[in-house]
């Protein structure tokens, strides 16, 4: 029972996860980060359901969240030496004796037939000698455990990389081609496809327990897409989302290792807010007013003004 009570503070004290500032895109990527960003992007794009566009010629419009940012992450891996440390110090008793020199002073006073002699003894204000005696034993004991990490959590400054956006756009075009959907310039298209990429970046985190430690790097890609028939203004694909994340993790014991390295790709949480539940206003007076009734199985159409704005015209 005593051993258990001693281990509980050791395991629970200073436990937590330090998460670095997320950054979109990135500057000079290292190989693992490239692999994760590519994996999450490919998985999200691959999940897009484009069956309604079979045999069509599509104009593709991709809008990506700004990929410029910077963060400063400082601090190294913690050392157990600061948490497990003890010492014992004992000094013997000490006594000091001081010897002050003494001197005599004689004063004689005469007046006619009378005279007097005064003698006094004084001590100097500074000792002539000092003697110190120690009694008892002197001892000093100390104990400690020091476990340092293999490196510091270095500073990061991530700059914009427009090639990330170009890479993602090319992936989307590749999937369209492999699905049998032709991507053409807007003037030759019969369908407009809009893809909005809300999340496209990496997140670093560190978990520090006394016995277990981990370094984790995640890459996330989250996007929303819909398609519009250019002639009828009908929604061929209502707003849908695709979200995936990839992860690289190194696990340590007392920052020794890593004893395990893992890579995973999985579906992540969807967008916090999407447009799948938006319907046209019932009292709109705009030209090409959508004809839409909830739960009637029909798809809303989209007016020319909406298309023009999405194109940036």
From Swiss-Prot:
Induction of the gene: Induced during interaction with human epithelial cells.
Lipidation residue positions, type S-diacylglycerol cysteine: 15
Lipid-conjugated positions (N-palmitoyl cysteine): 15
Signal peptide: 1-14
Membrane topology: Lipid-anchor
GO cellular component: cell outer membrane
Any GO BP: cell adhesion
Keywords, comma-separated and alphabetical: Cell adhesion, Cell outer membrane, Lipoprotein, Membrane, Palmitate, Signal, Virulence
Claim: Signal is one of the keywords in the record: yes
Region (Disordered): 282-313
Biased composition regions of type Polar residues, renumbered to the chain: 282-297
Cell location: Cell outer membrane
Family: Belongs to the MafA family.
Other facts: Present in outer membrane vesicle formulations which are used as vaccines in human.
Name the UniProt record assigns to this protein: Adhesin MafA
């Amino acid at each position: 029972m005593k051993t258990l009570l001693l281990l509980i503070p050791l395991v629970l004290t200073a436990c937590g996860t330090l998460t670095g500032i997320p950054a979109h895109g990135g500057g000079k990527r290292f190989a693992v980060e490239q692999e994760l960003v590519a994996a999450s992007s490919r998985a999200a794009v691959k999940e897009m359901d484009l069956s309604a566009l079979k045999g069509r010629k599509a104009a593709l419009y991709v809008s990506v969240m700004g990929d410029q940012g910077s963060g400063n992450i400082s601090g190294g891996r913690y050392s157990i030496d600061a948490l497990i440390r003890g010492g014992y110090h004992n000094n013997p008793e000490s006594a000091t004796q001081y010897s002050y020199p003494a001197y005599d002073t004689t004063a004689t006073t005469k007046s006619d037939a009378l005279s007097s002699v005064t003698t006094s003894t004084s001590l100097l204000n500074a000792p002539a000698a000092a003697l110190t005696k120690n009694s008892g034993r002197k001892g000093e004991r100390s104990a400690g455990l020091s476990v340092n990490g293999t490196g510091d959590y270095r500073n990061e400054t991530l700059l914009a990389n427009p090639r990330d956006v170009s890479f993602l756009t090319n992936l989307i075009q590749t999937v369209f081609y492999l699905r049998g959907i032709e991507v053409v310039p807007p003037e030759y298209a019969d369908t407009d496809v809009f893809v909005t990429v809300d999340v496209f970046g990496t997140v670093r985190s560190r978990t520090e327990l006394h016995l277990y430690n981990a370094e984790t790097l995640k890459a996330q890609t989250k996007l929303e897409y819909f398609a519009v028939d250019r002639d009828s203004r009908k929604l061929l694909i209502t707003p849908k989302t695709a979200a995936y994340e990839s992860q690289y993790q190194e696990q340590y014991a007392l920052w020794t290792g890593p004893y395990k390295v893992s890579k995973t790709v999985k579906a992540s949480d969807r967008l916090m807010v999407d447009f799948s539940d938006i319907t046209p206003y019932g009292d709109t007076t705009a030209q090409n007013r959508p004809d839409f009734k909830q739960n009637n199985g029909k798809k809303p159409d989209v007016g020319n003004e909406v298309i023009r704005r999405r194109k940036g015209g």
